[in-house]
Amino acid sequence: MSDLKPFVAKVAAREALSRDDARAAFEIIMSGAATPSQIGGFLMALRVRGETVDEIVGAVGAMRARMLHVKAPDGSIDIVGTGGDGAGTYNISTLAALIVAGAGVPVAKHGNRALSSKSGTADALSCLGVNLEIGPEAISRCIGEAGLGFMFAQQHHSAMRHVGPTRVELGTRTIFNLLGPLANPAGVRQQLVGVYAPQWVDPLAEVLRDLGSESVWVVHGEGLDEITTTGVTKVAALKDGTITNFELTPADFGLERVTLDALKGGDGAHNAAALQAVLDGAENAYRDISLANAAASLMIAGRAKDLMEGMDLARKSLSSGAAKVALQRLITVSNAA
């Protein structure tokens, strides 16, 4: 079938799609056979009715089948959020990724430019001088030599060109916010995944379990698709097929609570300058929340036995300059491609 309309009608009637039907629908979208109106109608019908685990797994299958793959070392991790939380914070996962890389865990980071916010990972890294327009071999070199490689979503998911304009015009969250973190081109099995709403914490952990992930935390922190320092973070931790639920507070990281205003960022240039300032030694709320997310990532990757050890390793990555060196090497290696 190459017609999306029957699937639009089914979802609009509040019927759930099977994994096979969901995969077929998203293959139609990614092949370019659907019109922008059909895509927009389908995405919004899914959102209003609510996406199911089977629909997400099927959609991810369609994305993964078409993506451009990257080789990464065993034990690599991704630190990624769905976006779409509307909070306008700094690029927290980006700084956390540099801290983790500086602590010696390879990071295969997947991200994009801002679609429904002011600054995505790609916007900040581009402003810092990282070359985003590089191929899989060069990204693998970045991971090997800098400890961090950035996989620009539009480079690795070229089929998304059929969806991008519609997503921008809609200007709101869709299932594609959920799919991005699930379709890492390096096939990482360890991730810290932030989701834009608390109701997605458990379902995405289930999806990742079904997709074969090994060690993952899916988190939501009081409106943020990150571990937050503003209050309570909900966590679904997947380890070897078992999902455990718990909550975290800033005190679990040895941190004080802050207001959301303390975490507000700006555009790519603004956030890049703030990130560089932390690498240069600034101590502020942006640093602290990034340390918390890095600490959790180090625990997920098995480098730290608990969050406090993760915080110690993360702080050393900053204080020793290792995180800053990771960025400098990423800039150098990416521009030598």
Swiss-Prot record:
Gene3D superfamilies: Nucleoside phosphorylase/phosphoribosyltransferase catalytic domain (3.40.1030.10), Transferase, Pyrimidine Nucleoside Phosphorylase, Chain C (1.20.970.10). Mg(2+) 2 binds at D225, E226. InterPro entries: Anthranilate_Pribosyl_Tfrase, Glycosyl_Trfase_fam3, Glycosyl_Trfase_fam3_N_dom, Glycosyl_Trfase_fam3_N_dom_sf, Nuc_phospho_transferase. It comes from the Bacteria. Anthranilate 2 binds at R167. Its EC number is 2.4.2.18. One of its GO terms (molecular function) is anthranilate phosphoribosyltransferase activity. It catalyses: N-(5-phospho-beta-D-ribosyl)anthranilate + diphosphate = 5-phospho-alpha-D-ribose 1-diphosphate + anthranilate. Pfam families: Glycos_trans_3N, Glycos_transf_3. Mg(2+) 1 binds at S93, E226. It is an enzyme of class 2 (transferase). Belongs to the anthranilate phosphoribosyltransferase family. Homodimer. PANTHER family: ANTHRANILATE PHOSPHORIBOSYLTRANSFERASE (PTHR43285:SF2). This is Anthranilate phosphoribosyltransferase. It comes from Sinorhizobium medicae (strain WSM419). The lineage of its organism: Bacteria, Pseudomonadati, Pseudomonadota, Alphaproteobacteria, Hyphomicrobiales.
